[in-house]
Curated annotation (Swiss-Prot):
It comes from the Eukaryota. This is Anti-lipopolysaccharide factor. GO terms for biological process: defense response to bacterium. It comes from Portunus trituberculatus (Swimming crab). May bind to bacterial LPS and thus specifically inhibit the LPS-mediated activation of the hemolymph coagulation. It has a strong antibacterial effect especially on the growth of Gram-negative bacteria. It is found in: Secreted. Keywords: Antibiotic, Antimicrobial, Disulfide bond, Glycoprotein, Secreted, Signal. Glycans are attached at residue 45. Disulfide bonds join 55-76. Its main location: secreted. Induction: By injection with live V.alginolyticus. Isoform 2 expression is highest 24 hours post-injection. Expression of isoform 1 and isoform 2 is reduced at 3 hours post-injection, increases to a peak at 12 hours post-injection, and returns to control levels at 32 hours post-injection. Isoform 1 expression is up-regulated at 3 and 24 hours post-injection and reaches a peak at 48 hours post-injection. GO terms for cellular component: extracellular region. InterPro entries: Anti-LPS_factor/Scygonadin, Anti-LPS_factor/Scygonadin_sf. Residues 1-26 form the signal peptide.
């Protein structure tokens, strides 16, 4: 019985060696391209038509206390002397909260009506 077990183990070892994947060359270019694509996607700048005015939005990553946050900034040069700002853990949340902050400030300064502001603040 011992010879059978040893023979079975030897056969299993030979089969495993034949079917093990062969080492291949690492594809660093594809890996680096993928990582850089993800990192550059964290920054975003755009312009939007907001209530008939050209406004701008910027989102950028920020690490605070070993956590990733997204800081958003929304401003409309030539219409409002202030800007909306936010810091959230969500990329899309940073744009939404910066816009809401801008609308709150625009309402306080009389640039928008309560009705127009409620459309943005209730969502």
């Amino acid at each position: 019985m011992r010879k059978g077990v040893v023979a079975g183990l030897c056969l299993a070892l030979v089969v495993m060696c034949l079917y093990l994947p062969q080492p291949c060359e690492a594809q660093y270019e594809a890996l680096v391209t993928s990582i850089l694509g993800k990192l550059t996607g964290l920054w975003h700048n755009d312009s939007v038509d907001f209530m008939g005015h050209i406004c701008y939005f910027r989102r950028r990553p920020k690490i605070r206390r070993f956590k990733l946050y997204h800081e958003g900034k929304f401003w409309c040069p030539g219409w409002a002397p202030f800007e909306g700002r936010s810091r959230t853990k969500s990329r899309s949340g940073s744009s939404r909260e910066a816009t809401k902050d801008f609308v709150r400030k625009a309402l306080q300064n009389g640039l928008v009506t309560q009705q127009d502001a409620s459309l943005w603040l209730n969502n």
